[in-house]
């Protein structure tokens, strides 16, 4: 028997050395975190930055290698005792999850120029979108401009703001049922749409759908995606089913 016998297995901290290493891209919120976020009994109930070892920000929050919390933007948010316990316990789903946080120790959402913070800020944002306003929302990798994708007037206003007269906008739908209501979706397309990458998928529009025509003028197709960040899911709670989603960039 040539099998080596070992007496110990240790998980040690990273060392800062030169070399090539794979850093995971950001991963859309997993089903387990989604379930926790909407569980009133969970301590991360409605937490807009919930994550675990299976999902959440990775490359976007990294400042330097190796990938450890003190070299990410989360270094500004020390873990509370409960999060620290999960982080150091290899039996938990958040063992060694660098961005781990909760409502007590993690970042909080806020509105620029308004007093609302936390859940109140999300509630007010929902109200603005329902009222036909355009909102800049900071997600995992930057800002996006959002509005009600069924409101023709506000979508046209967004086109004027972006100086984009005809280029199609992407649409974020609340869930798969909304996508199927607005577009023709094959099983293969649904599998891609609901995967952990949450890509923008080009789909055929239904003639009886409710999207504003200005979302993709004179185009039988529309780019659709599902929410990938917790804050997006929270904004969709008790809200309209679709929003027009565009990067906050100036056209070249």
Short names for language-model regions:
Residues 129-143, 147:
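Glycine-rich N-terminal segment of FAD-binding domains in flavoprotein oxidoreductases
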Residues 246-252:
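Conserved small/polar residues in nucleotide/adenosyl-binding loops
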Residues 7-8, 43, 60-66, 146-151, ...:
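Short acidic, glycine/serine/threonine-rich loops at helix termini
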Residues 3-25, 180-184, 190-194, 202, ...:
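His/Asp/Glu-rich metal-coordinating catalytic cores
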Residues 142-205:
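A phosphate-binding glycine/aspartate-rich beta-alpha loop in the early core of alpha/beta enzymes
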Residues 52, 102, 139, 158, ...:
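Residue-level signal for inorganic ion chemistry
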Residues 1-103, 107-110:
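Intrinsically disordered, low-complexity, mixed-charge
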Residues 82-87, 98-99, 104-110, 121-122, ...:
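Non-transmembrane, aqueous-exposed alpha-helical and coiled segments at domain scale
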């Amino acid at each position: 028997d040539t099998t080596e016998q070992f007496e110990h297995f240790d998980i040690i901290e990273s060392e800062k050395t030169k070399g090539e290493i794979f850093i995971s891209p950001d991963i859309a919120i997993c089903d387990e975190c989604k379930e926790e976020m909407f569980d009133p009994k969970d301590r991360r109930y409605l937490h807009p930055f919930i994550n675990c070892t299976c999902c959440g920000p990775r490359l976007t929050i990294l400042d330097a290698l190796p990938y450890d919390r003190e070299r990410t933007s989360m270094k500004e948010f020390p873990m509370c005792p409960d999060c620290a316990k999960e982080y150091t316990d290899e039996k938990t789903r958040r063992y060694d999850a660098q961005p781990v946080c909760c409502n007590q120790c993690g970042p909080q959402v806020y509105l620029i120029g308004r007093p609302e913070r936390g859940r109140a800020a999300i509630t007010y944002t929902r109200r603005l979108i329902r009222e036909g306003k355009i909102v800049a929302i900071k997600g995992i990798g930057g800002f996006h401009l959002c509005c009600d994708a069924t409101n023709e007037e506000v979508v046209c206003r967004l086109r004027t703001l972006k100086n984009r007269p005809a280029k199609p906008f992407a649409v974020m739908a609340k869930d798969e049922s909304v996508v199927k209501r607005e577009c023709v979706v094959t099983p293969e397309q649904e599998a891609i749409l609901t995967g952990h990458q949450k890509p923008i998928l080009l789909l055929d529009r239904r003639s009886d759908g409710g999207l504003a025509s200005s979302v993709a003028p004179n185009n039988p197709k529309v780019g659709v995606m599902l929410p990938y960040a917790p804050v997006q899911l929270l904004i969709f709670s008790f809200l309209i089913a679709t929003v027009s989603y565009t990067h906050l960039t100036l056209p070249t």
